[in-house]
Amino acid sequence: MQKLVIHGGSKLHGEISISGAKNAALPVLCASLLTAEPFAIQNIPHLRDVTTMLALLEQIGVRILTNEPGTTELSAANITNPTASYDMVKTMRAAILVLGPLLARTGQAHISLPGGCAIGMRPVDQHIKGLQAMGAEINIEQGYILAQVGRLSGARIAMDVVTVTGTENLMMAATLASGTTILENAAREPEVIDLANCLIGMGAKIEGAGNDIIIIEGVDRLHGGSHVVMPDRIETGTFLTAVAACGGDVTLIGTRADTLDVVLGKLAEAGADIDIGGDWIRLCMQQRPQPVSLRTAPYPAFPTDMQAQFMALNSIAGGTSIMTETIFENRFMHVQELTRLNADIQVEGNTAIVHGIPQLDGASVMATDLRASACLIIAGLIAQGETIVDRIYHLDRGYEQIEQKLAQVGAHIKRIN
């Protein structure tokens, strides 16, 4: 099993190029199911979840016309098998995103209940309720969602909780429904906006993406075309947090600051100097971080996907911080590993109290999920001595060449078998 070996203590200097966003690329790949015409997607990151999604689409009957670095062209002219098997879905929750497009395009879908990171219950009931409101007949049998419909009908759907994949699934399904669909309590994440822009480019009629009410007027068909996936805001935030923790001066290129307002504000609160350009962000840190308290919540609030990285930052901050997780239960699994590096953290329910100490000490730790992996890398970069991060297969689901990108700005990090 592969591991990362990190020798901490180095400041970071230089430039890092940001990849396309995994959480935008996956739904855009699924959107290719909505048209019989070729569809090209650019700025796709080379990640394990993307590879898994492409394999799933091929099983469904999608032809991959080209698959070059950063660009993939797909053709879903002949969908032969509207099924996502357990073997394909178990490692990637985003596979649920084929449900809406398959049902809208073919009238049927057989989708295994999803897996993914082990960070708590993330039910798909909002997807199912929404599609049922649009006229679909759905049953759960032997761990599979069995769905069928003649043609979906527009409906007013008020989601009980804010769900990004639920919003994306229902928005895609509604593009080919008869009539108008109104999604209430919709997710506002930039990735939802990116998907909406992709669908509009294919001929969909969508208004309100980025707000909590989205209106979709169904059309008879969507056409092909191309779409450029937005930069990864979580990768951007992860590298910025690493620089703020380690100290140094790094510019991230090919990214967007407008999707990271709250994160940038918290980094400034920690003491970082930040400059912003049209497609770049520069962060300079020349002092010990100040503690940053935060509370995760749906966008545009502080993202749950950045909570673990900020915990690593707070572990060596000059004071005490309070971090509250409101999105997922069981998303403090990295705390136990941070304490192996001598971090001083207490967990009380959904709140972690982090007492910053001057120095972490290197040790062997084990990654438990994708963002916990990033947290432990940052912790290793600031720890004295050697840190070994085990079970890093999580990393390859969401970060493209993270160790190479860190090494090019001065981190002492390498992957070993």
Swiss-Prot record:
One of its GO terms (cellular component) is cytoplasm. The keyword Kinase does not apply. It catalyses: phosphoenolpyruvate + UDP-N-acetyl-alpha-D-glucosamine = UDP-N-acetyl-3-O-(1-carboxyvinyl)-alpha-D-glucosamine + phosphate. SUPFAM superfamilies: EPT/RTPC-like. The modification 2-(S-cysteinyl)pyruvic acid O-phosphothioketal is found at C117. Keywords: Cell cycle, Cell division, Cell shape, Cell wall biogenesis/degradation, Cytoplasm, Peptidoglycan synthesis, Pyruvate, Transferase. GO terms for molecular function: UDP-N-acetylglucosamine 1-carboxyvinyltransferase activity. Its main location: cytoplasm. It holds the Pfam family EPSP_synthase. UDP-N-acetyl-alpha-D-glucosamine binds at R93, R122, P123, V124, D125, Q126, D305, I327. Pathway: Cell wall biogenesis; peptidoglycan biosynthesis. The keyword Cell division applies. Cell wall formation. Adds enolpyruvyl to UDP-N-acetylglucosamine. Belongs to the EPSP synthase family. MurA subfamily. This is UDP-N-acetylglucosamine 1-carboxyvinyltransferase. It comes from Nitrosomonas eutropha (strain DSM 101675 / C91 / Nm57).
